[in-house]
Amino acid sequence: MDRLNNLATQLEQNPAKGLDAITSKNPDDVVITAAYRTAHTKGGKGLFKDTSSSELLASLLEGLVKESKIDPKLIGDVVCGNVLAAGAGATEHRAACLVAGIPETVPFVALNRQCSSGLMAVNDVANKIRAGQIDIGIGCGVESMSNQYGPNSVTPFSNKFQNNEEAKKCLIPMGITSENVAAKYNVSRKAQDAFAAKSYEKAAAAQAAGKFDQEILPIKTTVLDDDDNEKEVTVNKDDGIRPGVTAEKLGKLKPAFSAEGTTHAGNASQISDGAGAVLLMRRSVAEKLGQPILAKFVHCKTVGVPPELMGIGPAYAIPAVLEDLGLTVNDVDVFEINEAFASQALFSIQHCGIDESKVNPRGGAIAIGHPLGATGARQFATLLSELKESGKKVGVTSMCIGTGMGAASLVVAE
């Protein structure tokens, strides 16, 4: 009867509330037993520039299975987020699972909810475990912006859509939405540059201290030099992190999207290549298999916001998750908020009343990079590593989503 009550609580639209509820341990909890990512490298310039998204994903999944020691035959589903590939990479990323040694009996699904795709993949697996459809699954995300980023990634709008005032806002360039947020909410250029410089500073310190080594799986690949000669390399470090970046230096950069604007290459996320993957399972199964439990996956929420202000998504997704759980921002120890742009990240932090010292302690996408479909999964690898090292418990991930949405999730470390 207790097990049925626990399961019923988990399946309710609104989960049990309060710190005691989220930190309790029940056999049917969804738990994370492994979370890894690849290094993130510069789009068109970095060591992954000649590596396809399918190759990236295959290498990461193979590494995840090896490091976790999970029997791949036990995996109930693999869900992969991707934004830029046709059909979210449904064909090539299914093939990547097979190359990684995951048997053909394990199904695969590709999904795309823009920059939250990696998180949506993790949440999809969690929901299937809660519903009793599977016991074990992998939620992952991957993006090769070197190979697939560009204007042709969006289908042209018909006259009907172009003449719909709300619908056509979905075509507003992301940089312009950043300018809209900065203008509407008075986020100054000076504040944005200071925030961006801090992201670089934190990321450089984390990299120098070897903190990212715990979350990054080295990937062997080949890269073409300037003479088109192939060279074998092992990629294990983010190459967009630059020590010595200051607000003063960033202040000299020209605006990228508007002559009078405040957004530029130094206070916006980097175009990047990379992947992330999270192994989830039912607590009772994890205990039976002797899998180390890193965290309990508690809740996830997605909200809609105006497309022209898409960056404010976290400002509304984070409170939505916390309200469902009967928590406040003060109950959260670490926030991983995607830095699509400094403007929107700063607004979201301030709108929610979050202590900025709790946000992105290892830096964020401005310094590390933002491979669109991978970020939501990457954040778990970074967050769980940080929670383990710091001894803290409650963590939140969040991001804005192109076309006007925001998503957030909450985990409790063990």
UniProtKB/Swiss-Prot annotation:
Q: What is this protein called?
A: 3-ketoacyl-CoA thiolase, peroxisomal
Question: What is annotated as the active site?
Answer: 115, 370, 400
**Location within or outside the cell:** Peroxisome
Q: Explain what the UniProt record notes about the effect of disrupting the gene for this protein.
A: Cells are unable to grow on solid media with oleate as a carbon source.
Fill in the transit peptide range: 1-9
- What EC number is given for this enzyme? 2.3.1.16
Keywords from UniProt, A to Z, are: Acyltransferase, Fatty acid metabolism, Lipid metabolism, Peroxisome, Transferase, Transit peptide
Q: Pathway it acts in?
A: Lipid metabolism; fatty acid metabolism
Name the gene.
POT1
Catalysed transformations (reactions): an acyl-CoA + acetyl-CoA = a 3-oxoacyl-CoA + CoA
Keyword Cell inner membrane in record: no
**Family named by the database record:** Belongs to the thiolase-like superfamily. Thiolase family.
Which Gene Ontology terms cover its molecular function?
Answer: acetyl-CoA C-acyltransferase activity
Is this entry keyworded Hydrolase? Answer: no
| Species whose genome carries this gene | Yarrowia lipolytica (strain CLIB 122 / E 150)
Entry function = Responsible for the thiolytic cleavage of straight chain 3-keto fatty acyl-CoAs (3-oxoacyl-CoAs).
Q: Assembly state and interactors?
A: Homodimer. Interacts (via PTS2-type peroxisomal targeting signal region) with PEX7; leading to its translocation into peroxisomes.
- Free-text note on domains in this protein's UniProt record: The PTS2-type peroxisomal targeting signal, which mediates interaction with PEX7 and localization to peroxisomes, is cleaved following import into peroxisomes.
